[in-house]
């Protein structure tokens, strides 16, 4: 790496948009998670979107809430290395402090069922990025593997509105094209594709 490249890297805010391989044992121990944190921080990563709830591993809302609680242990276990990201300013503060910012995220929203209140509860527990669907059709819209994308449902529209109101970032990775475009059109805030490829390059 050239000196200029190193300076750009060191000065940049770098966010891993789909991090899924971190967990802290209960009770916490100074072992693999500690080593992983060191590698990530040494690599210059500012923050990671930690996908705690993912539709490929189905869980009830109760199980999802317990997962959020359990994963919060990381902040108590490694207070000198981690900080929970709740606002954009927290990301800048993590960069300045040399700590790893952890953004709680979901890949899919099947765990909320058809109960909009869980979005509010997840937000209270620190979730700041929520992915609308995961590959398949849900109560909110269609995933990218559905042969026919019927678009954003009315419940999906309400979910987007709730996320906008709470300040949760709308993630459209794994979503179908029509569902994604309709969600973008309906949202009052920017959406992201935290982990996706460019169709023109990847077919």
Predicted regions and their residues:
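Active-site core of metal-dependent hydrolases
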Residues: 132, 136-203
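N-terminal hydrophobic targeting/anchoring segments and the immediately downstream early-domain regions
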Residues: 1-149, 154, 199-203
